[in-house]
C-alpha cells in the first residue's frame, strides 16, 4: 500500500492547459416533456467556452441498451445522451457546460433554464403498471419483457394435495445504492491519429464502446478508443456507461481535451441503482418427508426508465429463485417494468440478492410449518445427485452436503449461545441462508487475451480484465504464472498490459463474477499456446532469439468460450458452466423496545472452486458480507433528496459491521474453471440479508419481508403481547 495510484480526479491536475472542465445542467423533475432549453444566460458566465445540447451531438444521441431477447417489446434505443424530447428520471442531463474551470462550469450550469411540461411520475413498478399509467417511452409498453418458467409437471395438483404443506409470502428488495467512495469521473481527448480517446471507470470497455459509438457518430474501433482509469470499487454501477458519451460529445464538439467529475449528489442521482424486485413465492413440501415438491413464483423488476440489461436481470428471477434446492416442479412469471425512478444498473449479485431473498426467507417459514429445524430442511433439500437447478441444469459439482457438514457444529454452538445470552430487553437469534450464483454472462460467453514472449525472456499478458477493486492485475498475473509453470517463469517476469482497447482484446466486461473464469481461461489458453510454441521436439524450450530465428510466433492470441447454453423456452437451459455456492449464518441481537438490530457475527461457508489468491478472496467475501448487512438493515435510494448522501442512504458504519466475520472454504475444483477456480465477487452478497432477516425472526418473532429492516419495521412486526 503506497498511496501512489492516480485516479481519474487526479488526472485533471496533469491535463493540458487548454483542457475544458465540464458540468451538467440536469433536470430536477422525474418525468416531463421538454419544450425548450435556454442556454443564453449560461453562455455569458465567466470562463464559459460552449454550452452544448442535443443539437450538438453528431450521432443518434442514443445509448443502445443491447437488447438480449427477441421477445423484449423495446428496441433498446431509449436512453438519450443529452435528453431531447423528454425527461425520464430526476437528474437527466439536458446540457453540458464547457468552461475553463470546474467552478465556472458548475456556476454556469445552474443558469441553464428548461421549459418543461410536467407528466405523471411513476416512481415504482406498481404505479407504472396501473391501468391508467401512460407509456414512459411512447410506443413501448411499461411492461416490456415477460419471462415464463416451466420446469417439470404442472404445480397446481401439488398445492391442492392435502399431504403437502403449503407456504406463501410476498417480498420486496429495495433500490440499493452502490455507495462507492469515489464519485464518477472521466476525461477525453483527440489523439494524434484523430481518434476520440475516453478514459473512465468503465468495467466494460469494448461493451461500452459499442453502446455509445452510434450515438456519438463515430466508428469503433477505427475512431474510438476506451481506456480504464485506475478505479476503486464500483460494485457494478459501471457495467453501464455513465459519463462516457457525455465526455465524447464535448470533445467532438469543442476539439479540446475535456474532464468531467461528479460530486457525490450527482453520483447518487445520476448513476444506476439495484433494481427493486417485488416477488411472491409459494412452496409445497411433503408433510412426512419434508421434501419440496413444487414452487410457484411471480416477480416484477422495477428497472427505471432505461432498458439496458433489464431483460437479462429479470431472467435471474427464473434462474435463482429457489436455487440450491432440488425442486422438481416450478411455474412462474416475471416482468420488467419501466418507471421514472433511478435507472437499473448492475449491482454485485445482479439479480441473485433479489431472487434468493424471498425463497430463503420462505424456507424458514416452511420449516416452521413442517416443525423442522431450518438447517435440517435446507440440508435435506439441497442439491444432490439427480437434482437440477431451476433451469433444469445439472449442477457442475455436488458440494452442498459437504458445506452443510462444515457449518453444522458452528450452527449448534450459535443456537446455544443465543439462547444463553438472550434477555428480556435484548433478544438474540440465529439465521441461515443458502446462496448460489453463476459465474459469467448467460450461455456461450467468451473472452480473449494474448501472451507474448519478450527478448529478455519475460512474458507480457494482454487483456481487458477491468479492475474495480477486485484485483484484476493479481488475477491475471497469478493465472498466467500457473499456466507458464512448464517454462519455470518467476512471477516478477510476467508483465501486464491491461484495459486499453487500442492495445488489448475484447475480454468482456468485469461483471457477473465472469472474469476469473472467462478471462482466466483465455489467459490460460494463450499461455499454453505460447508454451507449446516454445517447446523443443527433444525437450526444453526455445529462447526468444531461437524463436525469431526459426520464424516461430512469439505472440499468441487466446480465446475461450463457455460450454453453456442460453435459457430458451420456459427459461430452461444451462446458462453457466461454473457456479459459486455459499452458506451464511447470522447471529443478531434485537432491542425489544426499539426494534434495532445489531449483527454480532457472520459466518460464511464458501465454495468458489480452487482459491487463486486467499488474501484477495478473503477481501471479496468480507466486503460482500458488509454490503449484505447494509442491504438487510439500512441501505436504500428511494427518497431522492434524503438518500443522496452516503449517510442519508444508510451506509453501514464501522459499528454496524461485526469484527467477528468467519470464513470457511470448501474448495471443490470446477471442471471448466481455470485450474479449478470459479468466480468470487457476487456470492458474498447473495445470502447475508435473508440470513439476517431469519435471525431477527428467530430472536424476537418479527418477520420482515420488505427490505430494509429498519427498527420501526422490526418493532411493528414483533408479536403483540
Predicted segments, located by residue:
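Flexible, low-hydrophobicity surface segments
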Residues: 1-140
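Glycine-rich loop/linker segments at domain edges
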Residues: 2-3, 69-77, 141-186, 276-361, ...
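Extended active-site and interfacial segments that coordinate phosphate-rich ligands
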Residues: 22, 110-123, 203, 214-215, ...
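C-terminal catalytic domains of large/alpha subunits in multi-subunit enzymes
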Residues: 55, 218-225, 253-258, 287, ...
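Short acidic, glycine/serine/threonine-rich loops at helix termini
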Residues: 61-67, 108-111, 209-211, 235-241, ...
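Phosphate/diphosphate-binding loops
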Residues: 100-101, 256-303, 521-546
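Helix-loop-helix junctions that connect adjacent transmembrane helices in secondary transporters/permeases
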Residues: 131-216, 382-458, 645-664
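Thiamine diphosphate
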Residues: 229-255, 259-262, 269, 476-480
Amino acid at each position: 500500500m503506497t498511496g501512489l495510484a492516480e485516479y481519474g480526479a487526479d488526472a485533471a491536475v496533469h491535463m493540458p492547459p487548454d483542457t475544458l472542465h465540464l458540468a451538467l445542467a440536469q433536470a430536477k423533475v422525474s418525468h416531463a416533456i421538454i419544450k425548450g432549453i435556454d442556454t443564453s444566460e449560461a453562455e455569458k458566465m465567466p470562463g464559459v467556452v460552449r454550452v452544448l445540447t442535443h443539437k450538438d451531438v453528431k450521432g443518434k444521441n442514443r445509448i443502445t441498451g443491447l437488447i438480449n431477447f427477441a421477445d423484449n417489446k423495446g428496441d433498446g434505443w431509449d436512453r438519450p445522451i443529452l435528453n431531447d424530447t423528454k425527461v425520464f428520471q430526476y437528474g437527466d442531463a439536458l446540457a453540458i457546460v464547457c468552461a475553463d474551470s470546474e467552478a465556472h462550469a458548475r456556476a454556469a450550469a445552474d443558469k441553464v433554464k428548461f421549459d418543461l411540461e410536467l407528466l405523471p411520475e411513476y416512481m415504482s413498478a406498481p404505479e407504472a403498471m396501473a391501468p391508467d399509467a401512460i407509456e414512459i417511452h411512447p410506443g413501448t409498453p411499461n411492461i416490456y419483457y415477460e419471462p415464463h418458467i416451466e420446469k417439470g409437471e404442472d404445480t397446481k395438483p401439488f398445492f391442492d394435495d392435502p399431504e403437502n404443506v403449503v407456504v406463501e409470502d410476498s417480498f420486496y428488495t429495495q433500490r440499493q445504492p452502490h455507495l462507492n467512495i469515489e464519485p464518477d469521473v472521466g476525461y477525453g481527448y483527440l489523439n494524434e491519429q484523430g481518434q476520440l480517446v475516453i478514459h473512465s471507470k468503465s468495467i466494460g470497455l469494448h461493451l461500452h464502446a459499442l453502446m455509445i459509438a452510434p450515438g456519438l457518430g463515430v466508428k469503433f474501433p477505427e475512431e474510438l478508443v476506451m481506456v480504464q482509469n485506475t478505479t476503486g470499487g464500483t460494485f457494478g454501477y459501471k457495467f453501464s456507461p455513465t459519463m462516457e458519451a457525455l465526455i465524447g460529445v464535448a470533445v467532438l464538439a469543442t476539439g479540446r481535451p475535456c474532464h468531467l467529475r461528479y460530486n457525490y449528489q450527482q453520483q447518487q442521482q445520476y448513476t444506476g441503482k439495484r433494481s427493486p424486485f417485488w416477488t411472491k413465492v409459494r412452496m409445497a413440501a411433503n408433510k412426512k418427508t419434508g421434501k419440496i415438491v413444487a414452487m410457484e413464483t411471480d416477480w416484477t423488476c422495477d428497472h427505471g426508465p432505461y432498458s439496458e440489461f433489464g431483460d437479462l436481470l429479470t431472467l435471474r428471477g427464473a434462474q435463482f429463485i429457489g436455487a440450491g434446492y432440488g425442486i422438481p416442479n416450478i411455474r412462474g412469471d416475471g416482468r420488467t417494468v419501466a418507471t421514472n425512478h433511478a435507472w437499473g444498473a448492475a449491482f454485485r449479485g445482479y439479480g441473485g440478492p433479489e431472487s434468493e431473498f424471498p425463497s430463503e426467507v420462505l424456507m424458514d417459514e416452511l420449516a416452521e410449518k413442517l416443525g423442522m429445524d431450518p438447517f435440517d430442511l435446507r440440508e435435506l433439500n439441497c442439491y444432490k445427485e439427480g437434482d437440477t437447478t431451476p433451469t433444469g441444469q445439472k449442477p457442475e459439482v455436488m458440494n452442498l452436503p459437504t458445506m452443510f457438514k462444515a457449518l453444522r457444529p458452528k450452527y449448534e454452538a450459535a443456537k446455544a449461545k443465543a439462547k444463553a445470552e438472550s434477555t428480556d430487553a435484548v433478544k438474540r437469534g440465529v439465521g441461515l441462508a443458502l446462496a448460489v450464483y453463476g459465474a459469467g454472462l448467460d450461455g456461450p460467453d467468451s473472452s480473449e487475451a494474448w501472451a507474448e514472449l519478450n527478448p529478455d525472456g519475460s512474458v507480457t499478458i494482454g487483456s481487458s480484465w477491468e479492475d474495480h477493486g477486485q484485483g484484476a492485475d493479481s488475477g491475471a498475473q497469478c493465472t498466467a504464472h500457473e499456466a507458464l509453470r512448464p517454462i519455470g517463469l518467476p512471477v516478477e517476469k510476467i508483465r501486464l498490459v491491461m484495459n486499453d482497447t487500442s492495445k488489448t482484446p475484447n475480454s468482456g466486461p468485469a461483471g457477473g463474477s465472469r472474469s476469473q473464469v472467462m478471462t482466466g481461461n483465455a489467459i490460460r489458453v494463450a499461455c499454453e499456446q505460447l508454451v507449446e510454441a516454445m517447446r523443443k521436439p527433444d525437450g526444453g524450450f526455445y529462447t526468444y532469439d531461437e524463436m525469431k530465428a526459426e520464424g516461430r510466433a512469439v505472440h499468441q492470441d487466446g480465446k475461450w468460450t463457455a460450454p453453456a447454453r442460453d435459457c430458451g423456452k420456459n427459461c430452461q437451459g444451462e446458462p453457466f458452466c461454473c457456479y459459486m455456492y455459499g452458506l451464511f449464518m447470522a447471529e443478531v441481537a434485537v432491542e425489544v423496545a426499539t426494534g434495532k438490530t445489531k449483527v454480532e457475527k457472520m459466518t460464511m461457508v464458501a465454495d468458489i472452486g480452487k482459491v487463486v489468491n486467499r488474501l484477495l478472496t478473503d477481501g471479496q467475501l468480507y466486503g460482500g458480507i458488509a454490503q449484505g448487512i447494509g442491504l438487510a438493515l439500512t441501505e436504500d435510494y428511494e427518497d431522492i433528496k434524503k438518500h443522496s448522501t452516503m449517510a442519508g442512504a444508510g451506509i453501514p458504519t464501522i459499528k454496524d459491521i461485526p469484527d467477528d466475520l468467519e470464513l470457511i472454504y470448501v474448495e471443490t475444483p470446477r471442471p471448466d474453471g481455470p485450474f479449478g477456480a470459479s468466480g468470487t465477487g457476487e456470492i458474498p452478497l447473495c445470502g447475508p440479508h435473508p440470513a439476517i432477516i431469519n435471525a431477527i425472526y428467530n430472536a424476537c418473532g418479527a418477520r420482515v419481508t420488505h427490505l430494509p429492516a429498519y427498527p420501526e419495521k422490526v418493532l411493528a412486526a414483533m408479536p403483540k403481547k
